[in-house]
Amino acid sequence: MDAIQTRSLTKYYGKARGIIDLNLAVAEGEFFGFIGPNGAGKSTTIRTLLGLISPTGGSAEIFGRDIAREREAILQKTGYMPSEAMFYPGMRVRDVLKLSAGLRKSDCRREADKLCERLQLEPSRKVDELSFGNRKKVAIVCALQHRPDLLILDEPTSGLDPLMQREFFDILGERNKEGATVFLSSHVLSEIQRNCSRAAIIREGRIIACDSVDALSRDSTKRVTVHGHVPLEGLEGIRDRQDADGTVSFLYSGDMNRLLRAFADGQVSDLTVSEPDLEEVFLHYYETADGSREAVSEGSGSQTGSTGESGFGKTASVQKDCGKDGEEL
């Protein structure tokens, strides 16, 4: 059974685009990454999956249950951490955790105490006295304390210091090994690369790439670093070129034979060809038609976005159906 299954899931805010025809399958027990900058549709996707907003079209299921008709049963098995960390002022941490557990009719005190200890969170503190990072810890405990089968996390590490980020991902890894499905929405690509087995990239409300993290990182692009002088003018497929002190480095997705001929015509003292990291691949997908790049900034996906055509060249009209293990839906 899939933990998450969407079929042409669509959300418009009036005439403004939210998400368009999302076809997504996340297997039970998978650690799945969802990548995109502000306004791409990440948070809209998550809020629609959780029934917090109603879709304009299409359908979605969580563990085989329809999100529109069986929301209460879905929430019993789901832990959700929003990108914001907002709570009722004046409440103490323990009261927030008790309220969250009560909504699921669960006694989570023992698990909450364990999580508070690991995250160095003091339950007696008032939430409005906490820093943003500590409020994020409260949100983490709320999402995890009932030991859900599915964790949906929207930009969870913003505000956490590096040590707490590491502890947080240790906890997620433990839960995933125990069988929980993790759906991680993030703009921090190193988090996706270290922790996720598969990922989807969303742009302007559409999934434009979906594959294993290894396959996305490999892509068909190579990072090339050359020491010496090589005639690269007119060679197609070069991006992100950087020249410094007799060394040129660039991403290359063109004909490798043509590149080798260029090396033969030049003077090369050293050469390195390596796989790009996920961040470089991601920026490739977000490259605009004129070769410039869209800004990729922190924060959660906006609820609204611009309409109109995509502007990133050959992949502009591509909409990927994201099945399991690369299969098409």
What are these regions (language model features)?
Residues 58-69, 73-74:
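Conserved ABC transporter NBD signature motif
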Residues 109-129:
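Conserved ABC nucleotide-binding domain
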Residues 140:
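Hydrophobic anchor residue at the start of the ABC signature
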Residues 151-155, 160:
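Catalytic Walker B motif of ABC-type/P-loop ATPase nucleotide-binding domains
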Residues 222-289, 293, 297, 302, ...:
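Short, charged/small-residue-rich alpha-helical element at the C-terminal edge
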